[in-house]
């Protein structure tokens, strides 16, 4: 386990990750978030902002659309990984980040990862 913690710490320092702020408000905010693996596989990775506000106990649906190979799957997994890393206690690949303590975007983290080869993730 110590080797995993050390690997996260070294990666955080080398890749300019930031300490996420865990909050009790139902808002997820990520400024200039990056996918930790995808950014290593391309010459230029465009960071993405994310804002999901679940206030007032209302159901929220966000629809993510775009052409094939435009990065939709990478974006969804990026947000899921940032939330997951924050809950692990790790720093995250972003400029700044606020993560609610109880949040899950429903993305399956166990899906295969052909995105690093420029392919979309097939539906499960």
Model feature map: region roles:
Residues 1-70, 74-76, 80-104:
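Alpha-helical coupling/stalk and coiled-coil linker elements that connect catalytic or binding modules
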Residues 37-40, 65, 106-123:
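Flexible beta-alpha connector loops of hexameric P-loop NTPases
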């Amino acid at each position: 386990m110590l080797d995993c913690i050390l690997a996260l710490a070294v990666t955080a320092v080398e890749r300019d990750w930031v300490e996420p702020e865990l909050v009790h408000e139902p808002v997820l905010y990520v400024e200039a978030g990056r996918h930790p693996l995808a950014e290593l596989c391309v010459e230029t990775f465009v960071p993405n902002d994310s804002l999901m506000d679940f206030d007032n106990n209302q159901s929220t649906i966000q629809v993510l659309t775009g052409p094939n190979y435009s990065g939709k799957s990478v974006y969804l997994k990026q947000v899921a990984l940032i939330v997951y890393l924050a809950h692990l206690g790790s720093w995250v690949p972003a400029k700044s980040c606020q993560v609610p303590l109880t949040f899950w975007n429903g993305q399956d983290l166990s899906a295969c990862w052909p995105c690093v080869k420029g392919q979309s993730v097939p539906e499960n």
